[in-house]
Regions:
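A short secondary-structure junction signal
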Residues: 115-119, 165, 181
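Long amphipathic N-terminal alpha/beta scaffold segment
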Residues: 50-120
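OB-fold and OB-like beta-barrel modules that bind single-stranded nucleic acids
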Residues: 168-169
């Protein structure tokens, strides 16, 4: 399945237009996809069960295929009434701005994000920190359009799956269009990972 990328005339990271597309069951749809990903990572079923599941997945893909849309039309990422705006890619999390000018919240990695030996896959941590730090840059500076220039992660401890973890993040400095940010992920009092990143504000119309 391939689609030509349709650039937005206003450039990259334009504010998404809110929608109610998908109706009242879109949240169930997103959560169902997440559960399916977890089962796909964990399942040890008999061959005939896998065959039946594969058949049903092909049927489901055929059902949805005629309705594929570009990123500007899909409700994914535009359902403001749902957690993470209904984006199925994002690590489940919740964040808020604190009174002292930082961003705090929680995140929970699922079975789908498992690497080996009970540890979250390192790439999944990259996805979380990119989301958290991008949000931090936007919320704390008021910048609406920026892209990641670099992201560095220091892995201190094994990060567990299926457990609510805590993060905090802040803006370290700004230099023109550059926004330097950092964050920490904890399990209670235990520091699990640290990250720092540079985000660059986009110029008008810049992709």
């Amino acid at each position: 399945m391939t689609h030509d990328r349709v650039p937005h005339p206003g450039g990259g990271f334009n504010p998404p237009e809110p929608t109610d597309k998908g109706g009242p069951d879109y949240h169930r749809f997103v959560e169902g996809v997440r559960r399916l990903q977890d089962h796909a990572r964990a399942v040890d079923a008999p061959d005939d069960v896998i065959t039946m599941a594969a058949d049903r997945l092909e049927e489901l893909s055929a059902l949805l295929a005629p309705f594929d849309a570009d990123e500007w039309q899909s409700p994914s990422g535009r359902r403001m009434d749902l957690p993470m705006r209904g984006n199925v890619l994002t690590i489940p999390m919740n964040a808020h701005k604190t009174d002292d000018g930082r961003v705090e919240g929680w995140a929970r990695f699922a079975r789908f994000h498992l690497g080996r030996n009970g540890a979250v896959h390192g790439g999944s941590l990259g996805m979380l920190f990119d989301t958290v730090l991008g949000l931090t840059a936007s919320v704390l500076t008021g910048s609406r359009r920026q892209r990641t220039a670099y992201l560095k992660i220091d892995y201190r401890q094994i990060v567990p799956i299926e457990k609510e973890l805590q993060f905090d993040a802040g803006v370290d400095s700004e230099d023109g269009r550059k926004i330097f940010v950092s964050a920490r992920l904890r399990d209670g009092d235990t520091l699990l990972t640290e990250a720092n990143a540079l985000f660059v504000r986009l110029k008008p119309g810049q992709p």
